[in-house]
Regions:
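Broad, structure-driven detector of short, well-ordered beta-strand segments within folded domains
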Residues: 103-109
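Compact, glycine/acidic-enriched structural inserts
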Residues: 121-147
């Protein structure tokens, strides 16, 4: 599991419960435990090799905090509501982290798997549904698997 720096204020179980109520979501226990330890921040190590072998390793720039923003990042609540309201991401994906290029890591709220959501490959001439499907890449079977398989950067 990575260590995170530049985290937001510590959370309580009540904070997480309020977060779930506010967004009308249910996050897995592993994600709750991670956020009780690290409320957002920058991970070290910061690389991950997706379970989909067709994908190259990815880098995680930051995890978004719950409840209180950091100096650099807004909260999951603000980011999710903004993206969902502008119909830029399916509402069944909860963005919780991003890479340095502005692409998101998201929890699928239905199957609890983790996906890499590309924002820099949006096709203005295609439907939202097409963009949603082609820009969503499976990378981990669960949040626990995701956070427990970070790897050191390769030279």
């Amino acid at each position: 599991m990575p260590e995170l720096s530049d985290c937001s204020a510590s959370l309580t179980k009540e904070d997480i419960k309020n977060f779930e109520v506010e967004l009308n979501v249910k996050i897995p226990a592993g994600m709750k435990n991670f956020y009780l330890k690290f409320n957002g921040g920058m991970p070290s190590p910061y690389c991950y090799q997706p379970q989909d072998e067709d994908l190259d390793r990815v880098e995680i720039n930051a995890f978004f905090p719950i409840k209180e923003r950091t100096n650099a990042f807004e909260t999951i609540e603000v980011i999710a509501k903004d993206i969902w309201s502008r119909n830029l991401m399916p509402c069944n994906l909860l963005p919780f982290a991003m890479d340095s290029g502005g692409n998101y890591y998201a929890l699928n709220l239905k199957n609890k798997k983790i996906y890499y959501y590309l924002t820099d490959e949006w096709d203005e001439n295609a439907s939202r549904e097409y963009n949603f499907e082609t820009n969503t890449r499976y990378i981990a079977q669960s949040f626990n698997y995701f956070i427990n398989h970070f790897i050191e950067e390769e030279e």
